[in-house]
Regions:
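Catalytic nucleophile loop of clan PA
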Residues: 5, 128-147
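Active-site substrate-binding loop(s) of clan PA
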Residues: 6, 31-32, 42-44, 62-96, ...
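Catalytic-histidine neighborhood of serine endopeptidases
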Residues: 9-52, 57-60
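C-terminal cap/linker of serine protease catalytic domains
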Residues: 41, 139, 143-182
Length: 182
């Protein structure tokens, strides 16, 4: 179980970004929206290096009342996020769905290394869970970081997130069904 964020509405389907880890090996994938309606989703593509997965949900499978409440997230510029910036952790930062926590960015200078790249990490003072997932949102409502279980900090009590600005190209390619070359 993890959270996801709606990153695009193509008119035919909604694209939802989540962690591959939590759907890997699943026989079926179901998405639950804030109004507790649940629909089936399909894996569109994933990046094995970062662990990001893109799901698609057919708009025709979603009730009109639910569609009317859905908003597509704006992926912001996390490079403008500085130490002391106020952020909201949305999704399941405590490991339970529909959680919201607030706090500040404590560092923007840390990074993680994957097979082919280094990614900036946003460290916060938000007490969360090592099983947490979701996004960090700035006060303008833009996603600036992606909280992922595989990249939790050494201090398991505080949330860290990968800087979304460095992931935009990967997210776009996955959303278009393209594979990520290594």
């Amino acid at each position: 179980q993890a959270s996801g964020v709606i990153i695009a509405d193509t008119g035919q389907e909604l694209l939802i970004m989540t962690e591959r880890k939590v759907i890997s090996g699943a026989k079926s994938i179901h998405v639950t929206f804030l109004d507790n309606s649940t629909v089936e989703a399909e894996l569109k593509n994933y990046d094995g290096n970062t662990g990001i997965a893109i799901l698609n949900v057919k708009r025709s499978d979603i009730e009109e009342s639910t569609l009317g409440r859905i908003k597509v997230a704006v992926l912001g510029n996390s490079l403008q996020t500085t130490q002391g910036s106020v952020v909201l952790a949305l999704g399941s930062p405590l490991g339970t769905n529909f959680s919201i926590l607030t706090g500040n960015i404590t560092s923007t200078s840390n990074s993680i290394s994957t097979f082919d790249a280094n990614y900036n990490v946003l460290t916060t003072d938000i007490v969360g869970s090592s099983q947490g997932s979701g996004v960090l949102v700035n006060l303008s409502g833009e996603v600036v970081g992606i909280v992922m279980q595989d990249y939790s900090s050494g201090d398991e009590n505080t949330l860290t997130a990968i800087s979304v600005s460095q992931l935009k190209d990967i997210i776009e390619k996955l959303s278009n069904g393209q594979d990520i070359p290594y």
